[in-house]
Regions:
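Conserved alpha-helical substructure of the radical SAM core
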Residues: 6-136, 147, 151, 163, ...
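Radical SAM enzyme [4Fe-4S]-AdoMet core and its adjacent flexible, acidic
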Residues: 37, 52, 58-59, 64, ...
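Conserved small/polar residues in nucleotide/adenosyl-binding loops
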Residues: 1-5, 282-284
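Short boundary motifs at domain starts and secondary-structure transition points
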Residues: 1, 22-27, 266-267
């Protein structure tokens, strides 16, 4: 899926992209990514997230029944290149998490991932998810010390994060193709802790995604200034990117010249993404 996305970015012609999508559609091929939030709730109140805003939380409620997810699967999963469970909330709060992952594999979705803070993910639950077809675990992390992790990820426990990483190591022995991704949102409080990643994460990391902080609604955290992150790029991010390359780890990071350019630029044409990525949430 990473290769497929990169191929899409290498093709610059919008018309050629649309032609390719049309051909995939008429030939019955897979061409969409599905991002599914089975429950609109979270056990964390991360300071950079809209779940730290009490008013926003009041509008985020509801759970998809498994039968409703089956209906979504029947309509869309046969077209999916990727199913990502969890994108704007915490999917491990759903009681049928493993069944949802298994449903993706029942429809032969090539790549099924789970995005989570991980604190509710026991070794038994993770093992069951991988056994039933989970290809990738994406863990959100906003710090690599207990102090910063628990400060930025309110309600989170650093010990549970570290325990989960140890469980991933054990599960990978049985399922070596299973992948671990870390999503790290960089701000002025945690940029220097990136140098500690290896002593915390160990040797099992497959993908590291680094994203400068952006405002995604109202949140408790208010420091969106990227000036220092830009200034520290060569000292902090470049060595990390090079170390990832040495370890054969995929590192997804912005270029220095783009560090202060918002990805959600209103002038950018995102029509291709709109027709190839399907977002499913529920409000009750």
């Amino acid at each position: 899926c990473i290769r497929d996305r990169r191929l899409g970015t290498q093709i610059k012609s919008r018309r050629l992209k649309l032609l390719g999508i049309w051909l995939f559609h008429v030939l019955g091929k897979r061409y969409i990514g599905i991002f599914l939030d089975p429950v609109l709730a979270c056990n964390f109140r991360c300071k950079m997230c809209y779940f730290s805003d009490e008013q926003k939380r009041k509008s985020l409620r509801g759970t998809l029944k498994y039968e409703e997810i089956e209906a979504i699967a029947g309509s869309l999963f046969h077209r999916a290149l990727k199913l990502q469970v969890g994108c704007g909330a915490e999917p491990t709060l759903h009681k049928d998490l493993v069944k949802i992952i298994a449903l993706g594999k029942r429809y032969n979705v090539p790549y099924v991932s789970l995005t989570t803070n991980g604190n509710l993910l026991t070794k038994e639950l993770l093992a069951a998810a991988v056994k039933n077809g989970l290809d990738e675990l994406t863990l959100s992390a906003h710090g690599f010390t207990r102090e910063t992790y628990e400060y930025l990820m309110t309600n989170g426990k650093f010990d549970l994060f570290c325990k989960l990483l140890a469980n991933v190591t054990e599960i990978k022995k049985q399922y070596p193709q299973f992948k671990l991704r870390i999503n790290y949102t960089i701000n002025n409080n945690n940029i220097e802790e990136l140098s500690r990643i290896w002593e915390v994460v160990g040797d099992e990391l497959d993908i590291l995604q680094l994203r400068p902080i952006q405002k995604i609604g109202e949140s408790e955290y208010r420091d969106f200034d990227l000036t220092n992150i830009h200034a520290r790029y060569d000292a902090v991010l470049v060595p990390l990117i090079e170390e990832c390359r040495r370890r054969h780890i995929t590192c997804l990071a912005p270029n220095k010249q783009n560090i202060i350019v918002l990805e959600e630029n209103e002038a950018e044409d995102n029509s291709i993404e709109k027709i190839t990525y399907c977002l499913s949430l529920i409000h009750i």
